[in-house]
Amino acid sequence: MPSDSMTDLPETRANAPEWTVSELSFALRRTVEDAYGHVRVRGEISGYRGPHSSGHAYFSIKDEGARLDAVIWKSAFARLKLRPEEGLEVVAVGKLTTYPGKSGYQIVIESLEFAGAGAIMAMLEERKRRLAAEGLFDAARKQELPFLPKVIGVVTSPTGAVIRDILHRLSDRFPRQVIVWPVRVQGETSAAEVAEAIRGFNALPEGGPIPRPDVLIVARGGGSLEDLLGFSDEAVVRAAAESFIPLVSAVGHETDVTLIDFAADVRAPTPTAAAEMVVPVRADLLAGIDAYGERLSAAPRRLLERRRADFRALARHLPTADALLAVPRQRLDAAGERLPRALRANAAAHRLAFEAVRTRHSASAFRLRLARAQDRVAALGGRLQWGLTGLVSRRSERLSAMTARFGSARAASLRAHVLHLSRCRERLSVLSTRAQRAVRHDLRERTNRLAAMEQLLKALSYRGVLARGFALVRDAQGGAVRAAGAVVPGARLELEFADGRLGVQALGEGAPVEPPQAARPSKGARTKAAQPSLFDD
């Protein structure tokens, strides 16, 4: 038996069909695709570097024991709800096939799903750690909410219950202008729309046709972890962190946590709570204003009462008028008692002084003082005579000595003065000659300039024109008439000739009218009629 088998083996190998490499590769491909078709593969994404320049994505899915090549075509990549990320545990749904160029097999992925909530949480923790390392969640970036915003921007779905709750709560507390930027809060485009809405509100110019909000609310109702995943998207987190407008995150319920909560300036547990955070209660503000008004009006009254109490306390410690005037009254009474005695003593003293003065000014005393004065005058006259005689003698001696000294000095001084006068006379003669030449030269120059100016004046003067036979016409006010149109018929004019002036009256356009021949007066007429003036009425 064995010998027979060994004998048939070469024949079997020889009868096997012959395949080309391509035929065998495509046969294996059909076998794999027919045997497995669409599969769901769970594993961790590895080697993902983003889409290729062609738009396709190439990476691997691995677990502890094996690795499977994966590819996502460009058309399928755009439809993915979950984008691949390095290290993300997913369930890949696709078609198993082979790649003849490398003699390997791969999965062509059509969709990706999270491999359970644990995979989602791991992905979110990794994203949170990476964004926190960039400083997007730092407390220093947080902004305070305005106390009373004029305009509130809301990023949410326009048809959900969330926007109705927010508007209702704002209306109850403090009605404000609300601008809603409609977005999808769930689905493939949710994250991109929310990020674009946040950036769109920040891009609104101040004072533009659409008012720029003072505060933003990003809101969504509760949902599963997958439903809220769009608000943990990196684009949404970065847009919230870069917002110049204070932003309140109100996504889900109090137990729901998304990454936008860490990037927002304030996190609200619910959308209704967000509305309560951004505006105060109007009734409470009015009550507070009333309370402040009452306190403000009561403060002056309390201050006035305290001042009155202080004044009354001080007044109680002040002495009475009788107590203040008691001592001065006693002093006044004592002075009143001493006054008559003092007046009598003063009068007696003045009488004694008067008697002494009268005694000193009596006739005998006056004669005695006169005699004494005469004696003193006589003595002084003798002393004065003796002194004058000595003074005249001393001055005569000094005058004689000075006369002798002055004679010689006077002669020398006189000679010096004569010499100085001679030199001055010579200098004066020279200066006089120079001055005469300068005056004559200046006079000639001034005469020449005057003659030139006189010639120029004659050339420019209108009188030169009059001397050539022309006349200057003036109106009744003395102004020059430059055009015939400026003269109305009957106007009085004045003609200025070179030898005098003549008054005329304008008759109108055309040649002048010949005056009538005046009748020759008779020889016997003794007086001539006075010639009428052109300016007579």
Curated annotation (Swiss-Prot):
Record's protein name: Exodeoxyribonuclease 7 large subunit
A GO biological-process term: DNA catabolic process
Homology family: Belongs to the XseA family.
Function, as annotated: Bidirectionally degrades single-stranded DNA into large acid-insoluble oligonucleotides, which are then degraded further into small acid-soluble oligonucleotides.
Alphabetical UniProt keywords: Cytoplasm, Exonuclease, Hydrolase, Nuclease
UniProt catalytic activity: Exonucleolytic cleavage in either 5'- to 3'- or 3'- to 5'-direction to yield nucleoside 5'-phosphates
EC number, UniProt record: 3.1.11.6
Quaternary structure and interacting proteins, as annotated: Heterooligomer composed of large and small subunits.
Spans annotated as Disordered: 508-537
